C-alpha cells in the first residue's frame, strides 16, 4: 500500500544581530605585517572573514517575527525559564483517499459510545504542503514538563505537594495494570472497567501514555521510563501502514482512538525528538488530515463523512500536539475546522454536539478550547462570554462529569484571569480527596461510588478512563503551558 512521503522540516531559525565593535588603533607592527604579506595571505584572511560573517547570519522567511518569551514568575518558586521559538516547513506532498458514504450512527458526545460501522481504509500517497496557522503559541507548550520549569509552574498556577502525590499514585496504578505486551485495556482486570465493549487497547494505551508523558516521563527518562518505553512500542504495533490507529471491527470510537494515539506519539516525539517516532507521527497526522469531512469541516465516526464537536475536539488536540512537536498542519485544514465550529454555535460563545443542536456545557468547553488553539485572542468577546457561562458551572463532586471537567480545566487554565482561580479552587482538592487511598485500586478514581460519573452511569468510560482524565487535570499546571502567557 502506498504511504505518504515524510515531511521534511527545516531547522529552527533565529535572527542574530551584529553588535558594533570598538575600533582599536593599528599598531605599527601589524601594519607592516599586512603590507609585507603575500597576496594569498590577504585572500585567505578575507575569505575567512566572509565565512565567519555568513556563519552568524541566518536568513528567516518571516523577518517580522520576534523572539518569544514566557513569563512563569512565581513568588514561591524563584528562578524561571527562557525559551526559543521553533518554525518548520515542508516539501510539497499529495494524498489520495477513499471516500466513505455516510452511515446511520447514534449521536453521542461520549468518546467511547458503542456503535459499529463497517471498517474502511484510506490510501495515502503523500501529504499536502504543511503551513503554520498563526496562533498564540505552538511550540513552547511542552516545556512545562521539564525539570525546574515544572516546579515553577506548580507554584505559579496552584499545584501543591498533595496534588503531585496524587499524580504519582495515579501513575503507579497505571503501571500496575500495564499488560505484558506493553498495552492497557479499558475493561480491566481492575474493578469498574468499561462495560459492553472490547478492550480498546488503542485508546487505553494512548490515554495511559498521555498521563505518563504529561508528568514529564518519556521512553528515555523519568521515573516511569520503562512503562513508557513498553507502551509506545505496543502502540506503534497497533498502527496501520497508512497511519491509522483503529482496528477492524471497532465501534464508533475510531477517530477518538486515532486522535488520542496521534496525540501520544506526537507529544513523545516533541519531548524527545526521537527520529524513530517522527514517521509514525507524520503518518497519523496525514491520515487525520485526509479524513476530514470535506463538506462540514470536522470529524465524526467515518473518514470524510459527517462532523460532530466531540470527535472534532480530539482531532484539534491531535493537531495541536503535532504543532507543538514541530509537525505543521495545513492552514486550510484548521480554517475548515473553524468553519464547522461557526455552524455549531448560535452566537460563538456556546456550542452544540452537532450543527443545529442545543448547546451543552461539555461541548461549549470543548469548542472554546479548540478556538483558543485555532487562534482566538483571550479578549475575544465570544470567548469571554463562553468562559463566563462555564464559570457558572464549576466542578461539583455530586455532579461528576470528568469529560466536561477535562475540557473546562484546560480552557480555564488558558484563560487565567478570574477564570482559573475560581475553577481551580473547586477542582484540585476535590480530585485529591476522592482518589482511592488503599487496596488494589489505590491511586485510581472509581467511576461509580456514591456519586457515579456521568459516563459510568452509561456503562462507558470505566476506571482507566476516569483515572487518566483526572490525572490530566492534576497535571494541568505544567502539562501544556498557558497559551496566552507567551509574549511576542
Residue ranges and their predicted role:
Residues 1-24:
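N-terminal intrinsically disordered, acidic low-complexity segments at the extreme N-terminus
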Residues 18-37:
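Juxtamembrane low-complexity tails/linkers enriched in Ser/Thr-Pro and polybasic
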Residues 34-38, 50-54, 60-488:
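Preference for long, amphipathic alpha-helical scaffolds in soluble/luminal domains
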Residues 40-42:
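Residue-level marker of motif borders
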Amino acid at each position: 500500500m502506498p504511504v505518504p512521503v515524510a515531511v521534511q522540516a527545516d531547522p529552527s531559525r533565529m535572527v542574530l544581530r551584529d553588535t558594533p565593535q570598538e575600533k582599536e588603533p593599528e599598531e605599527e607592527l601589524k601594519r607592516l605585517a599586512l603590507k609585507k604579506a603575500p597576496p594569498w595571505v590577504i585572500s585567505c584572511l578575507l575569505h575567512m572573514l566572509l565565512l565567519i560573517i555568513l556563519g552568524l547570519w541566518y536568513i528567516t522567511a518571516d523577518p517580522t517575527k520576534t523572539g518569544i518569551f514566557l513569563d512563569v514568575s512565581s513568588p514561591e518558586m524563584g528562578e524561571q525559564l527562557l525559551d526559543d521559538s521553533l518554525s518548520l516547513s515542508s516539501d510539497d506532498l499529495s494524498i489520495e483517499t477513499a471516500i466513505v458514504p455516510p452511515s446511520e450512527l447514534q449521536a453521542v458526545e461520549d468518546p467511547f459510545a458503542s456503535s459499529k460501522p463497517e471498517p474502511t481504509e484510506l490510501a495515502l500517497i503523500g501529504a499536502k504542503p504543511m503551513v503554520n496557522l498563526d496562533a498564540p503559541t505552538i511550540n513552547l507548550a511542552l516545556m512545562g514538563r521539564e525539570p525546574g520549569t515544572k516546579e515553577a509552574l506548580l507554584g505559579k498556577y496552584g499545584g501543591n505537594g498533595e496534588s503531585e502525590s496524587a499524580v504519582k499514585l495515579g501513575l503507579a496504578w497505571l503501571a500496575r495494570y500495564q499488560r505484558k505486551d506493553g498495552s492497557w485495556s479499558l475493561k480491566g482486570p481492575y474493578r469498574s472497567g468499561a462495560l459492553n465493549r472490547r478492550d480498546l487497547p488503542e485508546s487505553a494505551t494512548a490515554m495511559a501514555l498521555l498521563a505518563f508523558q504529561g508528568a514529564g516521563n518519556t521512553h528515555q527518562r523519568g521515573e516511569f521510563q520503562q512503562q513508557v518505553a513498553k507502551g509506545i512500542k505496543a502502540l506503534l504495533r497497533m498502527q496501520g501502514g497508512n497511519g491509522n490507529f483503529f482496528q477492524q471491527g471497532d465501534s464508533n470510537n475510531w477517530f477518538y482512538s486515532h486522535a488520542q494515539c496521534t496525540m501520544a506519539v506526537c507529544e513523545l516525539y516533541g519531548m524527545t525528538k526521537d527520529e524513530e517516532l517522527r514517521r509514525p507521527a507524520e503518518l497519523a497526522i496525514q491520515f487525520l488530515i485526509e479524513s476530514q469531512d470535506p463538506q462540514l469541516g470536522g470529524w465524526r465516526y467515518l473518514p470524510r463523512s459527517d462532523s460532530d464537536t466531540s470527535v472534532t475536539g480530539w482531532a484539534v488536540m491531535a493537531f495541536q500536539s503535532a504543532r507543538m512537536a514541530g509537525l505543521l498542519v495545513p492552514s486550510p485544514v484548521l480554517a475548515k475546522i473553524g468553519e464547522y465550529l461557526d455552524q455549531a454555535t448560535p452566537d460563538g460563545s456556546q456550542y452544540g454536539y452537532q450543527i443545529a443542536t442545543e448547546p451543552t456545557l461539555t461541548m461549549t468547553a470543548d469548542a472554546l478550547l479548540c478556538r483558543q488553539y485555532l487562534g482566538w485572542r483571550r479578549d475575544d468577546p465570544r470567548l469571554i462570554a463562553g468562559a463566563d457561562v462555564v464559570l457558572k458551572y464549576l466542578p461539583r463532586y455530586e455532579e461528576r462529569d470528568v469529560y466536561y471537567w477535562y475540557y473546562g480545566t484546560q480552557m480555564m487554565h488558558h484563560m487565567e484571569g478570574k477564570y482559573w482561580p475560581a475553577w481551580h479552587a473547586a477542582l484540585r482538592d476535590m480530585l485529591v480527596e476522592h482518589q482511592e487511598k488503599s487496596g488494589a485500586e489505590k491511586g485510581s478514581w472509581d467511576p461509580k461510588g456514591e456519586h457515579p460519573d456521568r459516563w459510568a452511569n452509561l456503562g462507558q468510560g470505566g476506571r482507566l478512563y476516569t483515572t487518566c482524565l483526572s490525572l490530566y487535570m492534576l497535571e494541568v499546571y505544567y502539562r501544556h503551558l498557558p497559551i496566552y502567557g507567551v509574549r511576542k
